[in-house]
A protein has these predicted regions:
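Nucleotide-sugar donor-binding/catalytic module of glycosyltransferases
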Residues: 2-160
Length: 160
């Protein structure tokens, strides 16, 4: 697909399992993106801690028509849960998101701009920070080498 001069559709795929403690901050960070995603797909793997009710309430309270929420009748495990979400996503660019991620407001805008300017890119990752509970920075992780990236792709099952 030639991406130049078109607006790419963005899909965010979130998976949850008993993540109520961190989830509201994460959902707010998605809602506050400078470049709103075209769709947010949330897949819950049978939570029992109030996660399901939190997500349903958040979507309803914020009138998020482009957000879809799925609850597995039977547990699938995190990898299958993510893979199902990625398969259902309709966007040109897919952003997987863990339930405890908090995204900077410019994440989608900046990463999408890079993809639009460089259509040859198939996989783009960004730096991240690991935070302690109160928000103090535990570690900042910078650019991975191609070998590390390939290892991550293979280990987490994003290839056949």
């Amino acid at each position: 697909m030639e991406w130049r001069n078109i607006i790419l559709r963005i899909s965010v795929v979130v998976t949850t399992y008993n993540g109520k403690m961190h989830l509201e901050k994460q959902l707010l960070s998605l809602l506050q993106q400078e470049r709103a995603p075209d769709e947010v797909l949330i897949f819950d793997d049978g939570s029992t801690d109030g996660t399901i009710e939190l997500v349903q309430s958040f979507i309803r309270k914020n009138c998020l028509e482009s957000w879809q929420f799925y609850v597995n009748a039977k547990r699938k495990g995190w990898k299958q849960n993510f893979m199902e979400g990625l398969r259902k996503a309709a966007g040109d660019i897919l952003f997987p998101c863990d339930q405890d991620d908090i995204w900077y407001p410019k994440k989608l805008a900046e990463m999408t701009a890079v993809m639009e300017q460089h259509p040859e890119i198939k996989l783009l990752a960004c730096d991240y920070r690991v935070l302690y509970e109160p928000g103090a920075i535990k570690a900042t992780v910078y650019k991975k080498t191609p070998a590390e990236t390939q290892g991550l792709i293979t280990r987490y099952g994003f290839t056949k």
